[in-house]
Amino acid sequence: MAERAGRRCCLGWDFSTQQVKVVAVDAELNVFYEDSVHFDRDLPEFGTQGGVHVHKDRLTVTSPVLMWVQALDLILEKMKASGFDFSQVLALSGAGQQHGSVYWKTGASLALSSLSPALLLHQQLQACFSVSDCPIWMDSSTTAQCHQLEAAVGGAQALSCLTGSRAYERFTGNQISKIFQKNPEAYSNSERISLVSSFAASLFLGRYSPIDYSDGSGMNLLQIQEKVWSQACLDACAPHLKEKLGSPVPSCSVVGAISSYYVQRYGFPPGCKVVAFTGDNPASLAGMRLEEGDVAVSLGTSDTLFLWLQKPMPALEGHIFCNPVDARQYMALLCFKNGSLMREKIRDESASCSWNKFSKALQSTEMGNNGNLGFYFDVMEITPEIIGCHRFNADNMEVSAFPGDVEIRALVEGQFMAKRIHAEGLGYRIMPKTKILATGGASHNKDILQVLADVFGAPVYVIDTTSSACVGSAYRAFHGLAGGTGVAFSEVVKSAPQPSLAATPNPGASQVYAALLPRYAELEQRILSKARGPLE
């Protein structure tokens, strides 16, 4: 993208699973430059597929740390070649794929702080890592370590109350624990352990960047209320871990000025600030500009809910993180596996493969579906753990089938009622000013969005989120520059492009769903108890 000279800006980076991406955002909050390096395509020598290596056991999934370093070299060289004016960059921040960890070898800090501008980063950091292939979020090889961690703190719910989530295989503490157990030498040779986000920030700083509260919440190690490492969790994972992690910081902290390497090699100004990097999900929350009481619903292959919470109630499902734009608040993530594929399956079966007919079915049926409720789980659901299709009539009797139109409304209403019930289970409450931001494939269907507005009793807006983690990182850089904790993020980003209104609740919707929601929750429990069978 062509760059206009002399445009003061902030950069937003995203070190994601498949690529490194950057955007430049000017003072009016317009994106005017973007670029990316795709790991498989642009760095084929690392032999990744989808940016990762899946190991023989099919459970272990890693990425080469030097691939990430080299990708940064490539993208900066591309920007330089395109004539990008680095001297106008006021600050930068970024995002990393969550949960992944990087292991810096003893002595690496010296190499980081004495980089020569004559050489590329990857030429100078070759010997800086004690683990060359980093565990990432797709890894599920740490079940034993998860059991050990939960047992050490008094069970899954106790761990969730402390850290915001029960033990998950991909969470960093369990991955560190596995490395300590399987490769104690690499662990003891690590002077610092970073998340992907704080690793990327360290490359820009020329010294170790602290982990931020929000991405730190995805480790099963941080006490989300007190914002300090939980000693009990650290002890359960590995010895001397506190020193290797460093102290966490608020997500909007300015962690320092950019390393002189970038000033000399690329022409960044010496005063360019680095704002703490965070996880890609928290950065997306910033990019979508969620505010208190808002919900973002990503309607994709799996459906994901992002919530802004004031008073979290950690549970055995979902994840609660410290909020990336307001350190006193929280955010939650809930994932539902049966998303668009389930909607497409019912479309094919009940609407002759036509979205048009699917929409007509939603238009021709009443809110509340005359009391008919359905649960549609083609694959084992995460929230809750149920599989199969279950249909109930207005008398709560299970039935084997619904007419096509009823089936379609039962599916869509059921999916959104489940989202509201599970969100409220984590402490979420709909407020008078609540907005729902819809993204992903199904957000183009106005009739699906109408049901979403009716079930939540709140207006639905659509927003373009193609680069939300990147753009959110640039917004966060502006926020850090403006003073971070002392300044409302919403003030800093108020001139950004507004989302567009797509649906408002129909009159009477709140009464209809006030009656249906408790019924849906009760039936869900009934199916769950039946699936689990009698207790041994």
From Swiss-Prot:
What does this gene product do?
Phosphorylates D-xylulose to produce D-xylulose 5-phosphate, a molecule that may play an important role in the regulation of glucose metabolism and lipogenesis.
Which family is it part of? Belongs to the FGGY kinase family.
| Stored PANTHER family | SUGAR KINASE, XYLULOSE KINASE
| Keywords associated with the record | ATP-binding, Carbohydrate metabolism, Kinase, Nucleotide-binding, Transferase, Xylose metabolism
Q: How does it assemble?
A: Monomer.
The answer to whether keyword Metal-binding applies is no
GO BP terms: D-xylose metabolic process; xylulose metabolic process
Gene this protein is translated from: Xylb
Positions contributing to ATP binding: W355, G441, A442, N445
Instruction: Supply the EC number(s).
Output: 2.7.1.17
Q: Name one Pfam family in it.
A: FGGY_N
Q: Give the binding site residues for substrate.
A: H99, R170, D280, N281
Q: What is catalysed by this protein?
A: D-xylulose + ATP = D-xylulose 5-phosphate + ADP + H(+)
Q: Which GO terms describe its molecular function?
A: ATP binding; D-xylulokinase activity
Q: What is this protein called?
A: Xylulose kinase
EC main group: transferase
Q: Which GO terms describe its cellular component?
A: cytosol
Tell me which domain of life the UniProt entry assigns to the organism this sequence originates from. Eukaryota
The record lists the organism as Rattus norvegicus
